[in-house]
Structure formats: structure tokens, C-alpha cells
Design a protein with these regions (language model features):
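Sec-dependent N-terminal signal peptides
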Residues: 2-33
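N-terminal propeptides/low-complexity segments immediately following signal peptides
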Residues: 31-65, 555
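Signature of exported/secreted
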Residues: 39-46, 73-79, 84-86, 90-388, ...
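Short beta-strand segments that buttress and anchor functional surface loops
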Residues: 271-279, 312-313, 411-413, 471-480
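Short, well-ordered beta-strand elements
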Residues: 310, 422-424, 496-506
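Surface-exposed amphipathic alpha-helical segments
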Residues: 336, 340, 345-349, 398, ...
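Secretory pathway targeting signatures of secreted, lumenal, and periplasmic proteins
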Residues: 384-387, 391-444, 478-479
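Signature of long, low-cysteine stretches enriched in small and polar/charged residues
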Residues: 442-494, 546, 550
């Protein structure tokens, strides 16, 4: 029976591997050649046969809302992305993990978390070449005050970070990542069994999000407890959705986690956690082995002990081998993590100081190139161009695979399936009085696509309320033997700053892609219109689709 939890965590889990890709960028320059789809307008694009089954199988799994109608010269509101609705979840085939008590309660603790990783990462180097392999070592540490609030509507947490840092070493190259001063007051919600960290008044960068997300997140540790009295040496299975959340994967195909009460002494219990899991993450297979212990308060005796959360200490060793996906390298690593939770009496004062410091830092950092402000919420990521040529808040299903002087390249991955690819390129500045016309954009596209060009399906021009003009041209054509669709956007602000955004996808995935290109464009801010004008509208009432933990009716492991 396949078990699945989805909600972003698995797509971003073991986030230091994303950092590893950046550290060793030259080594991965030719990663995944069999599924590469180039967005350079003048280059031929041939989709690999190997990509189609996964995408088509996943497309059958969900049917997002169709794209909205085409604008023709109307005035648009300033950036205000509204994401396509999530498909109706599959009915659960087995019960989910037991929910915590619902009476409203609040508790503040200090949590210290350490993660040490060693192993290797690998990526394909070509059809006839062996994978490129690089050694990796990670040293990550976290120290924060966590206030957990449990209500009838679920669990939320506020984390005030004293420290959050990681050092990643790949093949001798080192990169240090630390949570910024203006991003240390973090809110966390549970989307199913996936902890989703976010800022209340802004947006985290992908690097920050990757840093904060780890296996065995402290917010999930209580899901290891049985919720009933148990005797020493008695074992119980950990619910499938909780196990997937703890391991930060999408699907458990076989195996699982099991907990066993080992000792009860002086009001304290020790629980052993073991398991072997085969599943999938990001649409690729993964194999995980787990062995560890957790310590928790207990009442009763060795014949009938009631384990009372929260878990105060966890020591876990993991071994995972995960195949390379469309957006990240594969890895074969061993990890050791330690989490220690202690009650904290001065939480209120520290939280107030943290919030004050965050607000002050946000004020100092106003403007293009600084963190995008606005109503933050889970499922959105901020990207600031290194040269301050644009600013972007986007759906976290877009994954960056290249970020350099020539532009930004992202892939849209929905439930493990590669749906589309996008390039964002800053163009030379133009006279503000003469933004490119539809005819000029159409002519340039037809020339650059050359033999791939088929026909222009639709062209439109619109102006946002912040003064940014957008030319949008949708083109149908062929790449190899497959019908493709290219959607080109050229954005121009009042000061003449220009940005080209091109999305490409197979026509068979058009419905699944929906309005993702429009939502991406809505999140872009250019220097001439200022980041703040876009920031306040990014937090639209409609959030990204909740990808909550659930059990599908059948396996979706490739």
C-alpha cells in the first residue's frame, strides 16, 4: 500500500543539498542530460522520452484549474498572484496519524538541534558516462525558542532563532549559510504532516527555507508517541503520514517506522525508533534506514506507562540513498541529529525582543535588492536578483536550477512531475517612451525559435497599476517529435528596465500548468516601480494549494 504526504517539505527536504548544487555548480552543469529542456530561444529543444511517463502519470493524478482568459490591452492590478486551485485529495485508504489534543494550550521551550551529514552527492553526466560524484559534509546547528499553540484548528508554532547556520563542504569547496537577522522570527504551520516555515511580514529566500527544513523536525516528534498506555518492550507502528513527514519524503511504498518502549524510570521514558523505508521524493525513488531514541516524560509504571509529550530529547541516525531528480542531485549519506527541548521561563521577553529586532532590520533593508515585504504565508519564496535588476516572489513549486549572470532558470515541479521550465533574463534598458510592441516581440520570437516555430496562438499587451507594461505572446511549435508551447513575456517599467520571461511546456501538460506563468509574472517587481508596491499585494487572500498529508489509492513511485 502506498502512503503519501505532500506539502513542500519533501520537495525542499535536506535543503543543504540545494546549497551543495550551488557550491559545486560547475560539476552539475550538465546534470540530467536526458531530461534537459532548454529555454534559450535560439537553441533546439528536444524532450527526452524518459520524462514523459512520469509527467503523464502525475498529470492523471491531478487536474488544476485551467488558465484564465487572455487579456487584451486592459489595465492590470499590481502584482497579486492567485494560484491555481489544488485538486481534490484522494480518499484516505488508512487512518492518518493521531491528532494532538484539541483544547487550546500554549507552551514555550528552548530547542537546540544539531545535524551532521557525511556522504556523497551524484548527478548524471550523459547517456554513456558514469554519474558525477562528489563527497559532501554538512554541519548544521539551530537554537531557538519555540512557542507551540494547539487549538481545534491545528498546531502552529512561533520560533525565535538565536542561531541557525550550516556549513556545507562539497569536494573541498565550502559554503556557509546563516539565517538573516531580519528572518529570525519564524511562524510554522503544519500542512498535513509537513512543517511549513514562513515570515508573517515578508518572504524567506529559497536558501533560508532550505536551511530551516530538516528531517525529524521538532514539531513532529510527538507523532512518535502511541497516545495510549504501553508496557516496557511493547511496540507500536508510527502512522504512515507521520513517518513520511518525519523523513521528509513524499511516498512510503514499503516498510515504515516502529517505536518500542525501552525503559521507564523516575518519571522518564526512553523509546527506541527503528525502520526501513522505500519510497519516493521529488518523483524519484529513495531508501531510508532509521535508528534512534527519544526521551519523554511518563506517568505510571513499566506495565502501563502513559507517555506525555513533548519529546524532550531525540537522537537519531539515518542513512538515505535518493536518486537524482529533475531539480536536485541524488545523494547517498549518513546523518546524525540531536534535538534537545527544555522549558523556558523568559520566552515572552525574548519573543518581543526578537520581533522588535526583526522589524527594525526590515525597515533598514527597504528597497530593491532587500527582502520583499508583505503579508507572508507558506508556499511562497522570495528571490532577489544579485544585480538588483528585478525582485520576485513565486510559488515554491518553481525550483531554481541555475542562477547566474546570464539569467535565472527554474523548473515547475508538481507532485514530482516536471511540468514546465522557465527562464528569466534582464534585457538592456530601453527608452521609457518606447517599450517593445507586440509586433516586435512576435518578430523576435519567430526568428529565435527558427525551425521550432509553428504559429502564434495569442498576443496581448497590458499595463499594471504600478506602471509596468507587459507584452505576452503564446506560441505553438514542435521540439523534436513533440508539440510544445512557449509563453513569452516582456516586462517594461516606467524607467525603461526590461525583463524577459519565457515558459515552455509540452502541450499535453497545458491544463496542469494552468495560469502558473501569469502568477509568476504577478510576483515580479522591477526597479522603476519599487519593491514595496508589489510587496503589499503579494499576500492575496487566496494562498497556494494546501498539499496536505493523505494516503492515495495507488502507488505513484516512478
Amino acid at each position: 500500500m502506498a502512503r503519501r504526504t505532500s506539502g513542500g517539505m519533501a520537495r525542499r527536504s535536506w535543503g543543504w543539498l540545494v546549497v551543495a548544487c550551488l557550491v559545486a555548480a560547475p560539476a552539475w552543469a550538465e546534470s540530467e542530460p536526458e531530461s534537459e529542456v532548454s529555454l534559450a530561444a535560439g537553441e533546439p529543444v528536444v524532450a527526452a522520452d524518459g520524462d514523459r511517463p512520469a509527467a503523464e502519470a502525475a498529470a492523471a493524478e491531478a487536474e488544476p484549474a485551467a488558465a484564465s482568459g487572455e487579456p487584451t490591452g486592459e489595465t492590470l492590478a499590481a502584482p497579486e498572484p492567485a494560484l491555481a486551485s489544488e485538486p481534490t485529495p484522494e480518499p484516505a485508504a488508512e487512518p492518518a496519524s493521531p491528532e494532538p489534543p484539541t483544547p487550546e494550550q500554549e507552551q514555550t521551550d528552548r530547542v537546540r538541534f544539531k545535524l551532521d551529514v557525511a556522504g556523497e552527492i551524484f548527478a548524471p553526466a550523459g547517456r554513456d558516462a558514469p554519474p558525477v560524484r562528489r563527497p559532501i559534509v554538512v554541519d548544521a546547528r539551530f537554537d531557538f525558542l519555540e512557542t507551540v499553540r494547539t487549538t481545534e484548528s491545528g498546531i502552529t508554532a512561533r520560533r525565535c532563532y538565536r542561531d541557525a547556520a550550516a556549513e556545507v563542504r562539497v569536494d573541498g569547496a565550502s559554503r556557509a549559510t546563516r539565517l538573516a537577522d531580519d528572518a529570525r522570527d519564524i511562524s510554522v504551520v503544519l500542512r498535513g504532516t509537513t512543517p511549513a516555515p514562513h515570515l508573517e511580514g515578508g518572504f524567506l529566500s529559497r536558501e533560508e527555507l532550505d536551511l530551516l527544513e530538516t528531517p525529524f523536525d521538532p514539531l513532529l516528534l510527538d507523532r512518535l508517541l502511541p497516545g495510549r498506555s504501553v508496557a516496557v518492550a511493547e511496540s507500536w507502528p508510527v502512522a504512515a503520514d507521520a513517518a513520511a513527514g518525519l523523513l521528509a519524503i513524499d511516498t512510503i511504498e514499503s516498510g515504515g517506522l516502529e517505536a518500542t518502549l525501552e525503559t521507564v524510570e523516575n518519571g522518564e521514558a526512553t523509546v527506541k525508533v527503528t525502520g526501513i523505508v522505500d519510497g519516493a521524493a521529488d518523483g524519484v525513488p529513495t531508501h531510508v534506514t532509521v535508528e534512534g531514541t527519544v526521551t519523554v516524560n511518563a506517568s505510571g509504571d513499566s506495565t502501563a506507562a502513559m507517555l506525555e509529550g513533548p519529546v524532550m530529547r531525540a537522537e537519531v541516525a539515518l542513512r538515505e540513498r535518493r536518486e537524482a531528480s529533475h531539480v536536485s542531485p541524488g545523494f547517498d549519506v549518513e546523518a546524525r541529529l540531536t534535538a534537545v527541548r527544555t522549558p523556558h521561563a523568559d520566552a515572552g521577553r525574548h519573543a518581543a525582543e526578537s520581533a522588535s529586532g526583526t522589524t527594525a532590520a526590515a525597515r533598514v533593508g527597504a528597497g530593491m535588492g532587500s527582502r520583499r515585504q508583505g503579508t507572508g504565508r507558506p508556499g511562497f519564496v522570495w528571490h532577489g536578483d544579485a544585480a538588483s535588476r528585478y525582485d520576485l516572489v513565486y510559488d515554491d513549486r518553481w525550483r531554481v536550477i541555475e542562477d547566474g549572470v546570464e539569467g535565472l532558470v527554474m523548473r515547475f515541479v508538481d507532485r514530482g512531475a516536471l511540468v514546465a521550465q522557465c527562464s528569466v533574463t534582464a534585457l538592456p534598458r530601453a527608452a521609457s517612451q518606447s517599450p517593445p510592441s507586440i509586433a516586435e516581440v512576435e518578430r523576435d520570437i519567430e526568428k529565435s525559435l527558427a525551425g521550432q516555430f509553428g504559429r502564434i496562438e495569442h498576443s496581448s499587451e497590458a499595463a499594471r497599476s504600478d506602471g509596468v507594461r507587459i507584452v505576452r505572446v503564446a506560441v505553438a511549435g514542435r521540439a523534436g517529435d513533440l508539440p510544445f508551447r512557449w509563453i513569452h513575456h516582456v516586462l517594461t517599467d516606467a524607467a525603461g528596465h526590461r525583463l524577459a520571461v519565457t515558459c515552455m511546456l509540452e502541450q499535453s501538460l497545458e491544463k496542469r500548468f494552468g495560469a502558473a506563468d501569469r502568477e509568476l509574472i504577478d510576483g515580479i517587481s522591477l526597479p522603476g516601480n519599487g519593491a514595496d508596491s508589489a510587496a503589499e499585494t503579494v499576500g492575496a487572500p487566496m494562498g497556494p494549494p494546501d498539499r496536505e498529508a493523505r494516503v492515495p489509492s495507488e502507488s505513484r513511485t516512478p
